[in-house]
């Protein structure tokens, strides 16, 4: 059984037992999460969401991605700027897909 869920502005294809990286979700590790914005379950497609469909998961890890370095330099002056950014993420293991 598979489903397409929407979380963090992205659409993700999931199956039971999959581990997925999503944008940061509130919650502690080992806590349960529910995704109710389900776009499709097997061959049932919603308009825009499938009513009554829920995907259950468990938060495995809260973390940050690798650092991305942004460097700006204006060659006509001495202005230089170096920034770093680490995007927070949540690792979720899909435990159950409940469809229609």
Swiss-Prot record:
GO process terms (BP): translation
Pfam families attached to this UniProt entry: Ribosomal_L21p
Alphabetical keyword list: Ribonucleoprotein, Ribosomal protein, RNA-binding, rRNA-binding
Superkingdom per UniProt: Bacteria
Disulphides: none
InterPro entries: bL21-like, bL21-like_sf, Ribosomal_bL21
Keyword Ribonucleoprotein: yes
Gene Ontology CC terms: cytoplasm; ribonucleoprotein complex; ribosome
GO molecular function, one term: structural constituent of ribosome
Purpose of the protein: This protein binds to 23S rRNA in the presence of protein L20.
UniProt cross-references to PANTHER family, sorted A to Z: 50S RIBOSOMAL PROTEIN L21, LARGE RIBOSOMAL SUBUNIT PROTEIN BL21M
Assembly information from the UniProt record: Part of the 50S ribosomal subunit. Contacts protein L20.
Protein family (similarity comment): Belongs to the bacterial ribosomal protein bL21 family.
Name of the protein in question: Large ribosomal subunit protein bL21
Species the sequence originates in: Mycoplasmopsis synoviae (strain 53) (Mycoplasma synoviae)
Gene that produces this protein: rplU
């Amino acid at each position: 059984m598979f489903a397409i869920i929407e979380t963090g502005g992205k659409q993700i294809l999931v199956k039971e037992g999959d581990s997925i990286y999503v944008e940061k979700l509130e919650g502690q590790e080992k806590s349960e999460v529910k995704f109710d914005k389900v776009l499709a379950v097997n061959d049932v497609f919603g308009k825009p969401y499938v009513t009554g469909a829920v995907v259950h998961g468990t938060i495995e890890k809260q973390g940050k991605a690798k650092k991305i370095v942004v460097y700006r330099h204006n060659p006509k002056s001495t202005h230089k700027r170096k920034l770093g950014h680490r995007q927070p993420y949540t690792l979720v293991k899909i435990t159950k897909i409940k469809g229609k």
